């Protein structure tokens, strides 16, 4: 039997900036260091929350959905640049943003970026255990064209000091 080699050069990590995102990021960085690859950080603005913004704008509250999305993405970009990228340990990193249903946008990004591996947490923002990110993880596991690594919360991980 011949040895099988798998390329894991493009490692995508879904980050929602929750406590799970830090361990997700560190796992992706460790894998990229070991494989000589890059990390693509993906953040998705959930379109479900945007429906309320549109309603408020339509009622004359002066809130524009596109401006709101732009502001959110700038804030998240700044947080990623401050809290995550300095700890990349020399691993090349890119950040991409999407707007839509998180699981659908993650699958699209995996395909478009030709990711070799997806790293994601099993939970995310909020305490609605499976309602938001948990169900996102389930759908990504079922539909992803590449392998998916599930990262448990920070209480289960040994991070470098």
Predicted regions and their residues:
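A short acidic, glycine-rich active-site loop
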Residues: 61-78
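Structural beta-alpha unit
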Residues: 1-6, 34, 85-118, 155-161
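Short, hinge-like loop/turn segments at secondary-structure boundaries
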Residues: 56-60, 112-113, 136-137
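General small-molecule cofactor/ligand-binding pocket signal
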Residues: 42, 94-98, 149
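Short, flexible loop segments at boundaries between secondary-structure elements
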Residues: 146-154
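Small/aliphatic-rich secondary-structure junction motif
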Residues: 2-61, 156
